[in-house]
Amino acid sequence: MGDILAYEADLLGLVKEFLNFGEFQETLECFSKECKIKGKLLPRTSGSSLRESKTLLIQKDLITAFEDGDIKEFFALWQEHIPVETQNTNPVAQKLEFYLQIHFAIFPLKQSQGRIDRVDCEERISHFKTYLETSGAALSQTTEFLPFYALPFVPNPAAHPSFKEIFQESWEAELKMRLEKFLSVILKAASTPKLITLYKESLHNNQEQLQQLQQQLMETEHKARTYKKCFNKMQSDYHNLIGVTADLVDSLEATINGKLITPEYLQSVCTRLFSAQMKQSSAQSIDFTRPGTASSMLRASIAPLKQQEVPLFPSLDYEKLKKDLVFGNDRLKAFILQALRWRLTRSQPGEQRNTVLQAYISNDLLDCQHNEQKNVLILLRSPSEVVRQYTALLIDVCASLGYGRVYLSQNPRLLHSLVEAWKAEEKESIARETVLGILQKLSLRRSMQSAMIKDDLIFWLVRELEDPDHLSDYALQYTIALFMNLCLRTAGRKLCSRDADHVLKVLSDLLGHENHEIRSYVNGALYSILAVPSIREEARSMGMEEILRWYIREGNPDMNCHIEFIIRQLNSEDKFDESVESDDEEEEKDDEEDEDALEADLDKDEIIHAQSGELSGEKLLTTDYLGIMTNSFKVKKRMFAGILQSADEPLQRPVTPSSHRAMNTVRKNSNSPSPLTNTFKSSQANKMSLSSSRPPTRSGSRASSSDSIDSEASRLFSPNSLTDHRGAMSPTSPRILDLGMEKNIVQNSSKAWLPRSPEVQNATSRKTRTPTIAPQFSQSGPQQTSYSSSAGSSTRSRQSTQSYRK
């Protein structure tokens, strides 16, 4: 009841506004009278009155501009206040606009008292011609308007008999009356009462929620059916094993009592054991009386799967390919780009994919090792949207692979081309989001980070993040992840300090965004930039600690720990030596040991498809572009340098969203630590928190006067080397600080917890060779997992917010 009383006046005002809008005057009088009797106060100045006054003001301005012949003012107001849908689809609005264009075109001829302003007259006629060629072209087939298409070409329209009517005062007066009537109806419809707006929004939201729930229901039912089948299978196998076990126990007891086990009995037991994997006749044909046969078959059924040799793709004529990519027609370019991308995305991880990538690099497919004006990178500026998109997708695949990032970093003009393409593309285009993904992956390379910071890309990203609701989930995640990677550098933090107030406001707003997957990147960026004293002071002055503590109440335990670290950073007094660039100056190592990460939906929703007689994919490459000995293969060392960062701590190393998801997946799938380990970690964390107000590093609390967070991040260690100073992290090898653990524990745990994607493991399974003893039987036994996998799905919610993926 208290809630109703609190909002009662507003609710009564909404009802009053709606009744007034619908012209229910008698009902409104009765309603007002009854409210007065019951002591209910109606708002004196309702939203309706304000809207009505605003509508009248707009209408007055339009009529004034009409009478004065002010064409610019009139059509500026017209475009602003008349809905676009009404302008494009309403026949009354289209006809009225046509006559209004005529009115303004001949206005100087009607109002001139003597000398005519020829310049003004020519400008108006030119404007009218432009209208006839664009918006007015739709009415060119209408008999009523057909004569007026000759108006701009008549030297003296006032003297022409065909246009005599429009120069009469009655015509202008009638047009003004039609305009007033139209504006009163349209502007009133535009000022919809709040009650109707609330109803429409609620209805729209309910429909969206219903669709989401229906989709979730279908997925859940499908999973339930799958799980039920698995359960029934497991239950059947379990009962079968219990029965076989009971029979074997009876046999052992009989053996103790001196009874012999017959071959027929052993045959029946083995047949029951293998009945699920083998046909009955096949199982009965095997000689189980031979010693070791049954046990060998059992062991073989759970033996690790052996991988077959994967054939390499044929060599290509890359010179001809690059020539056709530059000078061919747009459709051919698109098919070539698609086929080259498919070679990478549809190849088997390992030798086959590495050979394809090395062939692209050694033959300089993207012209990253040369700086000719006419190279493949000009396709990013192609007038064809399909070519631009497919070019970006091919570069994105290369940027998803460790060697590919090294190769792309060799061209200093590539970054400039990518940034220009990103800025030039429309906000909801696939090409724009793909280019954003490329920039984010390239930000794993220290040289590319430096170039991006130098080009002030940080401020572009901040402007993008000002309005996150207009970004798809994919664009939002990759934008904030790129921003965080750049903020981890000393130069990036310095740049943020120039506009600290703006940056902090944008990040604090993102803390409350409904997409919780971005919280880790927001936390990492905040923690990093708060190392700068000037930014800390700005954050304190705007009450950042109160904002953060409010989110602690709302967040999950992991995020709460992140925020606690950020608050410690905010309240610290550590100095930030701007002259020290130790981590920025250190030599960058190639990230060849990084795990490669190909996103799952790179080949979804292909725009072009081969028609009858056209070649595409591998068939196109091997038919028209077959080469000789252009493949080169470099053995790629797999060094799982990544360690799992503590879930308590904000990100402090460059990551991609796919790598972060992989890290979280591994953390969730890993076994829970024992109580003893938990106690040990808790005690270590307590000791560290007592010794320093800053988040601890593996070397303890740092000196507050000289070390920066950059140097803290650069001292991270891997299972293979405790002095690894690489500045970039592979998309599937997150190598971030582990909090509160001894070195040997971190090393051991990191070897066991290797980030990988369950989806990709299924997608990249190889054909298996049949063991020499017997076929593989068990499909549920222990399997040897292959670690050469790509990252998990990028969850490109482009599809959730954009028409092309929606």
Curated annotation (Swiss-Prot):
First-listed, main subcellular location of the protein, grouped into a coarse class: cytoplasm
Residue ranges that the Swiss-Prot or TrEMBL entry lists as coiled coil: 194-230
Extent of Acidic residues compositional bias: 579-604
GO cellular component, one term: cilium
Biased composition (Low complexity): 689-708, 783-806
GO biological process entries: cilium assembly; positive regulation of smoothened signaling pathway
SUPFAM superfamilies for this protein: ARM repeat
Domain LisH: 7-39
Cellular compartment(s): Cytoplasm, Cytoskeleton, Cilium basal body; Cell projection, Cilium; Cytoplasm, Cytoskeleton, Microtubule organizing center, Centrosome, Centriole
Keywords from the named record: Cell projection, Cilium biogenesis/degradation, Coiled coil, Cytoplasm, Cytoskeleton
Polar residues composition bias: residue spans: 655-688, 759-782
Region Disordered, annotated ranges: 576-604, 650-736, 748-806
Superkingdom of the organism of origin: Eukaryota
Disulfide bridge positions per record: none
Function according to Swiss-Prot or TrEMBL: Involved in ciliogenesis. It is required for appropriate acetylation and polyglutamylation of ciliary microtubules, and regulation of cilium length. Acts as a positive regulator of hedgehog (Hh)signaling.
Name used for this protein in its record: LisH domain-containing protein ARMC9
Organism: Xenopus laevis (African clawed frog)
